[in-house]
Amino acid sequence: MTTESQSAVKTILHVESSLFGEGGVSSQLSTELVTKLQNKYADVNAKVNTNVKIVKRNLAAEPIPHLDLATITAIGEGKPVIGDTLIQELKDADIVVLGVPMYNFGVPSGLKAWFDHIARAGSTFKYTETGPVGLLENKKVYVVTSRGGYHKDAASDVEVPFLKTFLGFLGLNDVEFIYAEGLNLSGKREQGLADASAKIAALVGEEAA
């Protein structure tokens, strides 16, 4: 995990989950989005941007262990676990940017591990008489998803419904999806990348400063 030390006017949590690390399309496009957001909130009169703090999690470079019995036991005993840090990073963020490739119709296992650690009763959601309630409200989430084929709005896209359900369970309901599709199809890759970049530019333009 790396942190760029800047003032906390806006805190952006950037999570990359591509197995290819920084070389993955979802990583490159999500970085493009973070850079544009950073520039949007930059102080044009300052030599150094003091208006944005970026906290980055590269799950390929620094894998998070999958949730196991030992971790669950430690949580129950009130002992410190890695999820404490991950949850605090999420709570501190004003904006969350997720780079999420589609692997075998689902999310990367590293991202699923991150999800399992941040979903904790009493911290990111709570149980009530009427059902669970998410505790992470008033945060903007951007999901940049890359796919080899075309799945958007099709029955084969089980990834986005899962992401919407999981994020919404935590109270993260203000979610924008950016799609880069057709990346493994002959003659379609460049258009897929261009469409995603255009969507990023449009969304950043709409983001309130």
UniProtKB/Swiss-Prot annotation:
Keywords: Flavoprotein, FMN, NAD, Oxidoreductase
EC number, UniProt record: 1.6.5.-, 1.7.1.17
Gene3D superfamilies xrefs: 3.40.50.360
Residues at which FMN binds: S18, M102, Y103, N104, F105, S146, R147, G148, G149
Its biological purpose: Quinone reductase that provides resistance to thiol-specific stress caused by electrophilic quinones. Also exhibits azoreductase activity. Catalyzes the reductive cleavage of the azo bond in aromatic azo compounds to the corresponding amines.
Species: Saccharophagus degradans (strain 2-40 / ATCC 43961 / DSM 17024)
Catalytic activity: 2 a quinone + NADH + H(+) = 2 a 1,4-benzosemiquinone + NAD(+); N,N-dimethyl-1,4-phenylenediamine + anthranilate + 2 NAD(+) = 2-(4-dimethylaminophenyl)diazenylbenzoate + 2 NADH + 2 H(+)
Enzyme class: oxidoreductase
InterPro entries, per the entry: Flavodoxin_fold, Flavoprotein-like_sf, FMN-dep_NADH:Q_OxRdtase_AzoR1, NADH:quinone_OxRdtase_FMN_depd
Cofactor(s) this protein cannot do without: FMN
The family this protein is said to belong to: Belongs to the azoreductase type 1 family.
Name of the protein: FMN-dependent NADH:quinone oxidoreductase
Cofactor remark from the record: Binds 1 FMN per subunit.
Membrane-spanning parts: none
